Amino acid sequence: MFVKTFPRILKDEVWSKVLTLGMILFLILLADAILSFWVPNFIQDSLQSSFLMGLVISFSSVVGFGADLIFPQILRGFTVKRLILLGILSSFIFSAILLGATAAPYLVIFLLAMAVWGIYYELLGFGEQQFVADSTPLRLHSAAWGVMSIFRSLAYFLGPIIGGLLLARGDRTPAYFAILLTFLGLVFLMLAREKHKRPIEIDVHEVNLIRELAHWKVLFSHVWPIVIMSIFMGLVDATFWTTGAVWSHTLSERSWWGGMFLPLYTLPSLFVGFVVAKWQVFEGKKRLAEKFLFFSGIFLAMLGLTDAIFFQLLFVFVSSTLLAVSFPLTDGVYSDIVARMGRERRHLIGLSRSTISIAYIIGPAWAGFIASTIGERLTFSAVGITVVVVSAVLLLTTPKKLKLPQEEIKKWE
């Protein structure tokens, strides 16, 4: 069935664009995933502190949060292609700084690398949001995010595995390989000449952070359930890619299977993305995402019950499978609202991107602090219990429809 359907998909203009961007992002994010596995272990070994490691990685999101405020004001006329290109250039700089850090592992160099990392990630995020909102019809927003999440999840599944193999060949090898993959992504982007040329149609001539924060305040008062849910999903993700990377390495010292802890966190999105795309959920995305997040938190908390590798892998796989459904559903809600906002959509894109930055500002330092007191394994229990409580409250309080103040939005300049 898939063999017969695939040629028709390639001929479809919308899905052709989705698959093209997905392949480009796969190469870029595979490079990022390799570095994301290596960097927490490298920083923690260099600084000899899980808490300091968390603080350093949190700095990337402090910069990313600032980018969320500034980018909507300065991206006038930028195409998706140009945003991705700038992200690729930032990735090259990030890898180069990390190469320098292997020779001089000083705190200031780590902070500089994290600053570039924060900018790079936000550029890619703005590009993705703009692409889905403009290049796919409303009814396919969740499906588009589901398919793109497959490419993302494949990259982050393979990244830790490849990163572990590369690290065995030397400290610099992961960075060299990441540069090669990023270059391949650049080649694919240059070949996609006609697919991502539509510019962001905004008309802003100055950077006004106070005004942007005021816009966010207005939007938050109307879309707060989805913002809060995004933050806590981001906290889970931040925990896995900091404390989880260290815990995965610790388990791998006991057994080869232990090294699959972090890859199994990313694996479910490979097949869950197909399921979400097939559902084509049009209504009820918010509450459905909250329900899946609730049960994901339960299994995440169960990681603290035992350190047996079999149960560690089982619980993380089930928890991640449930969480993997929530992500594209939540992104679909954002895309629905973005499509209703007209030329002022950039403000909601900035707000949605800021939730990830906030999660990664709080998450690594919070997880690192907990890990320094009760250990990596129990850190997941603490995060899981928090997620269960928050998602339960959201299920009880989320309104059926998120309404925007359209008249007020029309007055924004």
Task: Please give the residue ranges for each predicted region.
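Symmetry-related core transmembrane helices of the 12-TM Major Facilitator Superfamily/SLC fold
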Residues: 174-191, 380-395
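Helix-loop boundary and gating motifs at the non-cytosolic
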Residues: 5-61, 222-261
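Juxtamembrane intracellular "pre-TM" segments in multi-pass secondary transporters
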Residues: 1-15, 194-226, 411-413
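Helix-to-loop junctions at the C-terminal end of transmembrane segments
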Residues: 67-80, 167, 272-285, 371
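Intracellular juxtamembrane helix-capping segments at the cytosolic ends
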Residues: 123-136, 326-340
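Cytoplasmic helix-loop-helix junction between adjacent transmembrane helices
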Residues: 117-151
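C-terminal ends and interior cores of transmembrane alpha-helices
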Residues: 90-104, 295-307
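C-terminal transmembrane helical hairpin of 12-TM major facilitator-type secondary transporters
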Residues: 286-328
